[in-house]
Amino acid sequence: MGKKNTKGGKKGRRGKNDSDGPKRELIYKEEGQEYAQITKMLGNGRVEASCFDGNKRMAHIRGKLRKKVWMGQGDIILVSLRDFQDDQCDVVHKYNLDEARTLKNQGELPENAKINETDNFGFESDEDVNFEFGNADEDDEEGEDEELDIDDI
């Protein structure tokens, strides 16, 4: 029997991120399904999802995905709409970063969809924060090259 290079049992192998396997096939939406982005994690297997048809829905993570596929805020998911409840849906599939980029490039996702490489930690704003680092006191620069004293500040 050969010796493995990993230490420990199943949990030691869990941290290893092997992406050598074949890429999985991209799943497109069908009738009764919609693409969405997770806006808030609610707990108890539920998330608040902002669907790309313009509605915000409470999404239920189905048992096949629960505890196996970890979801976070900003992730792109595929939800199955319910016929009898318009404000609720079921999470069918979670797209990884490369799949979400591919969907956006193929026109499946709208252009204004933000695919987050990093988590936005609950800050959900469409406008960018701009800082101007201009000269606040331009009269100080008019030929005086004196050093600042601590008392002047």
From Swiss-Prot:
Q: Which UniProt keywords apply?
A: Initiation factor, Protein biosynthesis
Entry keyword Cytoplasm: no
Keyword Protein biosynthesis attached: yes
* GO annotation terms (biological process): formation of cytoplasmic translation initiation complex; formation of translation initiation ternary complex; formation of translation preinitiation complex; translation reinitiation; translational initiation
Please give the coiled-coil regions recorded for this protein: none
| GO CC, alphabetical | cytoplasm; cytoplasmic stress granule; eukaryotic 43S preinitiation complex; eukaryotic 48S preinitiation complex
> What sequence ranges are listed for the domain S1-like?
22-96
Tell me one GO molecular function of this protein.
ribosomal small subunit binding
Q: Which InterPro entries match?
A: NA-bd_OB-fold, RNA-binding_domain_S1_IF1, TIF_eIF-1A, TIF_eIF-1A_CS
Output compositional bias ranges, type Basic and acidic residues: 15-26
Annotated CDD domains: S1_IF1A
* Pfam families in the cross-refs: eIF-1a
Q: Where is the composition biased (Basic residues)?
A: 1-14
Which region ranges are annotated with the description Disordered?
A: 1-26, 133-153
Q: Which PROSITE patterns does this UniProt record tie to the protein? A: IF1A, S1_IF1_TYPE
Q: What else is known?
A: Present with 35100 molecules/cell in log phase SD medium.
Q: Which family does it belong to?
A: Belongs to the eIF-1A family.
Biological function:
Seems to be required for maximal rate of protein biosynthesis. Enhances ribosome dissociation into subunits and stabilizes the binding of the initiator Met-tRNA(I) to 40 S ribosomal subunits.
HAMAP family from the UniProt entry = aIF_1A
Its protein name is Eukaryotic translation initiation factor 1A
- Species of origin: Saccharomyces cerevisiae (strain ATCC 204508 / S288c)
Task: Supply the gene name.
Answer: TIF11
